Amino acid sequence: MNIILLGPPGAGKGTQASKLVADRGMVQLSTGDMLRAAVKAGTPIGLKAKAVMEAGELVSDEIVSGLIGEKLDSMAASEGAIFDGYPRTEAQAHSLDEILASRGRVLDHVIELEVDEDALVERITGRYTCANCGEGYHDRFKQPKVAGVCDVCGSAEFKRRPDDNEETVRTRMAEYRAKTAPILPVYEARGLVRRVDGMADMADVSAAIAAILDN
């Protein structure tokens, strides 16, 4: 089972991918993480990517495709892949088909976590964490049981991410739409796209994804 998981920042894509990794033994292929790991490990593709990045240039499709291929080659045939952040262009979508086919794999589903932009803004701008233990809270959905005191460690210090503001969230939504717009029609034409309500309860989102994969 090989899937592409799509969703704007804050839609819970990372949470759902982690659950698929834990529950089904799938492997998450996040191009950003893979790029950093390849550079750190000094693999041939990593060295090539490092030279490109140090020159201030964008990493080419060829390098990204090489990373994907390298990762798939290290996986057991029984392990499914979750593609995160790739493909982003029609050319990359076709390249992924070739990469999978050459390894006896196919793309089974493209799952998009749909969100309401205004509700997503509220979800993201209201979140904060304990500065000591990292426990997560929300202005509306999850307040500490005792105001100003962390439920887990008792700390009175909390912090918010500086980019959890409305302007940044809306900019990211626009960027997400611009990046996914080219590839969704490609997969819709092939009947691969399934949409899930990303604003639902986390467990309900997980159940909806599981139903798609088990169908």
UniProtKB/Swiss-Prot annotation:
Residues 126-163 are annotated as: LID. InterPro entries: Adenyl_kin_sub (IPR006259), Adenylat/UMP-CMP_kin (IPR000850), Adenylat_kinase_CS (IPR033690), Adenylate_kinase_lid-dom (IPR007862), ADK_active_lid_dom_sf (IPR036193), P-loop_NTPase (IPR027417). ATP binds at G10, A11, G12, K13, G14, T15, R127, A200. SUPFAM superfamilies: Microbial and mitochondrial ADK, insert 'zinc finger' domain, P-loop containing nucleoside triphosphate hydrolases. CDD domains: ADK (cd01428). Zn(2+) binds at C130, C133, C150, C153. Its EC number is 2.7.4.3. GO terms for biological process: AMP salvage. Consists of three domains, a large central CORE domain and two small peripheral domains, NMPbind and LID, which undergo movements during catalysis. The LID domain closes over the site of phosphoryl transfer upon ATP binding. Assembling and dissambling the active center during each catalytic cycle provides an effective means to prevent ATP hydrolysis. Some bacteria have evolved a zinc-coordinating structure that stabilizes the LID domain. HAMAP family: Adenylate_kinase_Adk. Monomer. This is Adenylate kinase.
